[in-house]
């Protein structure tokens, strides 16, 4: 930049009207300061001695004569000055051209000051931006350091240092103080404690499905416990489970383990051990005092009620409308329930009775029924109460209860794939009793509540998805030796919180024989009706 200022001063001195002063110094200086090509230097040398005019008309002929601008004007118009600025600016922005002298390429001896000022301003702006970015990086780096430091000793030292210069206004420590204080307010130990307590509370109140399956197995009452009112009551009731129920569950588990050990001792080594691993330990025998009460009573906790379901197709109409019978799968084979499909019904309608010889609706032994929709993919289980739509009764207890609802969904894998089932049942109270659900109209039933996702006081169960076996070429489930033949009707119903806790299991063992095992909180009537729903044809599913 200093060289350019000197050249500009010399050029302006040559253009001014002083002839005597300009001729003597310019003649020796121009050949030294202009190491231009030979052709351009010749033009300059011929012009200088011929007419040393003060106006400088001859020096402007090669470059400025074409544009027609007089060089005497000290302040050219901005419009005229901007035209050569674009060409000169391009030259200045070229990194290689900056190293050269502009006088080597341009014959014009005068360089515009406006372009130099713009270039300097651009460089200054770039420098300022770089400095600003460096300052920002320097400012942002210090607060990151306290976040990385986790040791308590360093935090204590920093506290002491931070408390000292509080009165100094010019100290650079105050800006990072809030970050350090925030980290100190919530130390790692206290945060983990709070989170642990929250997780414990949520596990006790809401019973998250991520909980351990062992705890779900030990307390099936808590898994199926619901409140009759708001969810807050439900959480309180789940927290306050009686200790007596827990003791009973522990005693039942101990009894089951004792039975397992006694059975294994009596068996010989070798094959007996393999069978013991495959099959479940037999549950203690279930006593049936009164059939009506037993059929409606939930299964005892910690026990599996094993039953056998048989189908009778004999007779003229038995092929289309067979009868079904349920017995306990024991040596005595105690009869529990019987069911048949009604003939003059628009939809699938099964009557369930506790008398195998009298399957009429008007009999005293009528205990419940199973009814489906037109498509045959949704079923509802009722007891023997009164229908609220046919005859209104002032006594609410006489109205029928909805004991269960079964929904069959179309499988994604095609018609030959496994079925998808959803079972809705009433929840259980703290006294291990079923919550009564007596809808007074069709818009308050289990299916409508399930569609509207208002599942208060209800429990939603699903079938356990089977696994494809390449060796057998079919979908398989582990029935623990209770099912021997493949069938679309084979299924296992489980709870989402504990997939290993099988609430209901149904499968084929012969052409007209099936096994039916159910556990708490189901009763025999619910299990039998759910199994009957699998026999009916489903237009939307298969």
UniProtKB/Swiss-Prot annotation:
Pfam families named among the record's database cross-references: Tub
Protein's cellular compartments: Cytoplasm; Cell membrane; Secreted; Synapse
Membership in a protein family: Belongs to the TUB family.
Role: Required for normal development of photoreceptor synapses. Required for normal photoreceptor function and for long-term survival of photoreceptor cells. Interacts with cytoskeleton proteins and may play a role in protein transport in photoreceptor cells. Binds lipids, especially phosphatidylinositol 3-phosphate, phosphatidylinositol 4-phosphate, phosphatidylinositol 5-phosphate, phosphatidylinositol 3,4-bisphosphate, phosphatidylinositol 4,5-bisphosphate, phosphatidylinositol 3,4,5-bisphosphate, phosphatidylserine and phosphatidic acid (in vitro).
SUBUNIT field: Homodimer. May interact with ABCF1, PSIP1, ZEB1 and HMGB2 (Potential). Interacts with DNM1. Interacts with F-actin. Interacts with TUB. Interacts with TYRO3.
Keyword Cell membrane: yes
Composition bias, Basic residues: 262-275
InterPro entries linked: Tubby-like_C (IPR025659), Tubby_C (IPR000007), Tubby_C_CS (IPR018066)
Ranges of Basic and acidic residues composition bias in the record: 91-104, 146-157
Source organism per UniProt: Homo sapiens (Human)
Taxonomic superkingdom: Eukaryota
Biased composition (Acidic residues): 114-132
Region (Disordered): 1-289
Biological process, per Gene Ontology: dendrite development; detection of light stimulus involved in visual perception; eye photoreceptor cell development; phagocytosis, recognition; photoreceptor cell maintenance; positive regulation of phagocytosis; protein localization to cilium; protein localization to photoreceptor outer segment
Cellular component, GO annotation: axon terminus; cell projection; cilium; cytosol; extracellular region; photoreceptor inner segment; photoreceptor outer segment; plasma membrane
Annotated protein name in UniProt: Tubby-related protein 1
UniProt tissue specificity: Retina-specific.
GO molecular function: actin filament binding; phosphatidylinositol-4,5-bisphosphate binding
Main localization category: cytoplasm
